[in-house]
C-alpha cells in the first residue's frame, strides 16, 4: 500500500467521571471516552500515531496499569490492540517506519516496541519527564510501555524542532503543544484529496476545551494548556484544517473509521 491515507482507529474506551475530562464539571457523573489512534500510509513507509492502549490491558488491566484503574477503567478487546488492527488492514508491521508519540501517557503507548523496523519519535522533555514524573502525574505513565531496550528513538526539542516535517513532504508535521503533558505534541496532516486535518490529541480532549469552555481534568500546566489551544486554533484557522479532538465521545463518531480512510 503506497497511497497516502489517514486511518482513524480506536483501541476501546476508558470509563471515568466527567470531572476527569472536564475540570470541576459533572457532579460525579459517569463518563466514557474513546481511545483513538491513527495510521498514515505513505510510499516512504507507514506511521502509527500513538497506538492507543497497550493490548495487555484487554486481558489484565489492573496487572498492567495498577491503581490508575480506579480512575480510568479500560474497556478493550484483544483484537482492538494496535498491531491486530494494523494487520487487519492488510499492512505488514515490518512496513511501519515511524511510531510517533504525542506524549507517553498510558492510553497512547500501545504501539511502542511492537513494530520491528520503526523509529520512535517523541519530544525529549516528554521522554525524560516520563521516567521521573511529578507526584500528581506518576499514575499516567506506565514505564514498562516505553522503557524497552533496543528501540530506536528520535528526540525532538520543543520550540527548536517545532513544525517538524516527518516525511519532508508536508504530509505529517508535529506541532509542539505542551500543557496536558510537558512534552505534548499535536499533528497537522495534509492529504491530497481530503486536505488538512489537525489532530489535537490531548491538547484538547473535547470541543469544550477547544472552544475554551472547560479545562481538561488532568494537566501539567494550566497556562501552557490554554496557550497551546490558542496556538492550535490559530493554526486551524490559517490552514483551514478539520479539527480532530483527542477523546471526545460526541465528536469522534462523526469521523470515518477504518477500514474507511481519508486520502
Curated annotation (Swiss-Prot):
Q: A single Gene Ontology molecular function, please?
A: acyl-L-homoserine-lactone lactonohydrolase activity
Q: Which UniProt keywords apply?
A: Hydrolase, Metal-binding, Plasmid, Zinc
Task: Write down what this protein is called.
Answer: N-acyl homoserine lactonase AttM
Q: Binding residues for Zn(2+) 1, per the UniProt record? A: 103, 105, 180, 202
InterPro entries reported for this sequence: AHLLactAttM, MBL_superfamily_lactonases, Metallo-B-lactamas, RibonucZ/Hydroxyglut_hydro
- List positions binding Zn(2+) 2: 107-108, 202, 247
Q: Which SMART domains match?
A: Lactamase_B
Give the stretches traversing the membrane.
none
Pfam family of this protein, just one?
Lactamase_B
Give me the reactions it catalyses.
an N-acyl-L-homoserine lactone + H2O = an N-acyl-L-homoserine + H(+)
The EC class name is hydrolase
Keyword Transcription regulation among UniProt keywords: no
EC number(s) from the headed UniProt entry: 3.1.1.81
Q: Which cofactor does it need?
A: Zn(2+)
- Cofactor comment text: Binds 2 Zn(2+) ions per subunit.
Q: Which family does it belong to?
A: Belongs to the metallo-beta-lactamase superfamily.
Tell me the superkingdom of the source.
Answer: Bacteria
Amino acid at each position: 500500500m503506497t497511497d497516502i491515507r489517514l486511518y482513524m482507529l480506536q483501541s476501546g474506551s476508558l470509563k471515568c467521571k466527567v470531572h476527569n475530562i472536564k475540570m470541576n464539571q459533572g457532579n460525579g457523573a459517569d463518563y466514557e471516552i474513546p481511545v483513538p489512534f491513527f495510521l498514515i500510509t505513505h510510499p516512504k513507509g507507514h506511521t502509527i500515531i500513538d497506538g492507543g492502549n497497550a493490548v495487555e490491558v484487554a486481558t489484565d488491566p489492573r496487572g498492567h496499569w495498577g491503581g490508575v484503574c480506579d480512575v480510568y477503567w479500560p474497556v478493550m478487546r484483544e483484537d482492538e490492540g494496535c498491531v491486530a488492527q494494523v494487520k487487519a488492514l492488510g499492512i505488514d508491521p515490518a512496513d511501519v517506519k515511524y511510531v510517533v508519540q504525542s506524549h507517553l501517557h498510558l492510553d497512547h503507548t500501545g504501539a511502542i516496541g511492537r513494530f520491528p523496523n520503526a523509529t520512535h519519535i517523541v519530544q525529549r522533555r516528554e521522554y525524560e519527564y516520563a521516567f521521573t514524573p511529578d507526584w500528581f502525574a506518576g499514575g499516567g505513565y506506565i514505564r514498562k510501555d516505553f522503557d524497552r531496550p533496543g528501540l530506536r528513538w528520535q528526540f525532538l526539542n520543543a520550540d527548536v524542532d517545532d513544525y517538524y516535517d516527518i516525511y519532508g513532504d508536508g504530509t505529517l508535521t508535529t506541532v509542539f503543544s505542551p500543557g496536558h503533558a510537558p512534552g505534548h505534541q499535536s499533528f497537522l496532516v495534509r492529504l491530497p484529496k481530503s486536505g488538512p486535518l489537525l489532530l489535537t490529541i490531548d491538547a484538547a480532549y473535547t470541543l469544550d476545551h477547544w472552544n475554551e469552555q472547560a479545562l481538561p481534568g488532568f494537566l501539567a500546566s494550566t497556562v501552557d494548556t490554554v496557550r497551546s489551544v490558542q496556538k492550535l486554533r490559530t493554526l486551524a484557522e490559517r490552514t483551514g484544517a478539520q479539527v480532530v479532538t483527542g477523546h471526545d465521545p460526541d465528536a469522534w463518531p462523526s469521523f470515518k473509521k477504518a477500514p474507511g480512510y481519508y486520502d
